[in-house]
Amino acid sequence: MAAKDVKFGNDARVKMLKGVNVLADAVKVTLGPKGRHVILDKSFGAPTITKDGVSVAREIELEDKFENMGAQMVKEVASKANDAAGDGTTTATVLAQAIVNEGLKAVAAGMNPMDLKRGIDKAVSAVVSELKNLSKPCETAKEIEQVGTISANSDSIVGQLISQAMEKVGKEGVITVEDGTGLEDELDVVEGMQFDRGYLSPYFINKPETATVELDNPYLLLVDKKISNIRELLPVLEGVAKAGKPLLIIAEDVEGEALATLVVNTMRGIVKVAAVKAPGFGDRRKAMLQDIAILTAGTVISEEIGMELEKATLEDLGQAKRVVINKDNTTIIDGIGDEAQIKGRVAQIRQQIEESTSDYDKEKLQERVAKLAGGVAVIKVGAATEVEMKEKKDRVDDALHATRAAVEEGIVAGGGVALVRAAAKVAASLKGDNEEQNVGIKLALRAMEAPLRQIVTNAGEEASVVASAVKNGEGNFGYNAGTEQYGDMIEMGILDPTKVTRSALQFAASVAGLMITTECMVTDLPKDDKADLGAAGMGGMGGMGGMM
């Protein structure tokens, strides 16, 4: 086992604080409408330019192991805030730095760290309750646009696109962010249910100019197995041919003789058919086939429930107004499914989302809800260079998460004002059990001014003057660093999602409390490489002597 280096008390805390400040100072320059960029070197390719706090935090690793421990703990704050609300990482880092700096000064002055922590926890709990009182619902398209704009570093086009996307696919809908091909940002909305499986044979294409298969008012045959024998399909094909409608087959796979016969029939114009693989794998595939069945009022032909493909009739087939298939995707538009059954299925999947512990599973279930509930929106980010594209994509992702958080828990005045107002409201009545807890409460409430001060500093103004003016104001009165004007923050469209502000404060206080109560730090001693090399060299010399 490697030897350890151990530091106690003030020695440990000084080192840890240095690491906290290095990381926080690098992250906090990105805060606010006039926040600066940080350039991150990459081991290969062009450097990355970003204004995303968590991206900066993730890159920082310090040489001194004690300092690095401090930095890593603040990095945890940024990551946790990012996971919880998708934004607010820089605010969380600034708050953590402020609480740790104030707290460690009090510890150095001889106060009890545990009582300080209890005081901080009381202050945070009271401020979180007050934030909920200050919060107002985020419902209108204008408010959604404003939240998106602020979170994308005052990029109004991004705010508009997110607002339009939510209008088109609903607040629960899936909105994804992809690389665009031009210089402009675009919004692409896919209505209906789309899944990532294309046609099994290019011979099914009936629109050569777009290389797609388009079927109007088709029947849909849903099968939970591979189809290789055409005999199994004959009864269904005959029924569909008599009805004079096209057919889409969605199965685990269609291969061999069955696929060849379908292609020949399509090319001869006997019956208009297309086949695609079912989306997903394993249990997820079965669930998605069932989703399609409910959407199109069909039945999944599954041997598990004793159904046979040869005995399938037209009553077992689903129907839709239109189906469009390209080489990568299949889109089912306007299935004829019963609205009540679709809503029941959506409610069932939402229940699974609530119970799921895996982020990946939640994301996949959320996608299924969106596909059943009405569509998917894709924001295509345009930029002149790849470096700009990465930076912009990060901002759009942040804005999207912030907007979802705003819809979920409402909005408060932005620009650091909500924390200042909430802190002022609880300061008068909140008392600790002893004097040291009161100091903890005061230092936590004082630290809550830090985001406002940092936004002002990044805008090149004097933080103390602005903070004093804001504290003397009331309600939503604050300072708009973008236009350098005072006024009502909500009227000016400077909004923060309540969830983002709340999460940032809670995670910052949690980690800062642990750091203030740290008394000992243990790390591995660095290995002495020179000594190792020297020993190896001596061994070689001995060998030489033996040969002589």
UniProtKB/Swiss-Prot annotation:
It catalyses: ATP + H2O + a folded polypeptide = ADP + phosphate + an unfolded polypeptide. This is Chaperonin GroEL. Keywords: ATP-binding, Chaperone, Cytoplasm, Isomerase, Nucleotide-binding. CDD domains: GroEL. It comes from the Bacteria. ATP binds at T30, L31, G32, P33, K51, D87, G88, T89, T90, T91, G415, D496. The gene is groEL. InterPro entries: Chaperonin_Cpn60_CS, Cpn60/GroEL, Cpn60/GroEL/TCP-1, GroEL-like_apical_dom_sf, GROEL-like_equatorial_sf, TCP-1-like_intermed_sf. One of its GO terms (biological process) is response to heat. One of its GO terms (molecular function) is ATP binding. Forms a cylinder of 14 subunits composed of two heptameric rings stacked back-to-back. Interacts with the co-chaperonin GroES. It is an enzyme of class 5 (isomerase). Together with its co-chaperonin GroES, plays an essential role in assisting protein folding. The GroEL-GroES system forms a nano-cage that allows encapsulation of the non-native substrate proteins and provides a physical environment optimized to promote and accelerate protein folding. GO terms for cellular component: GroEL-GroES complex.
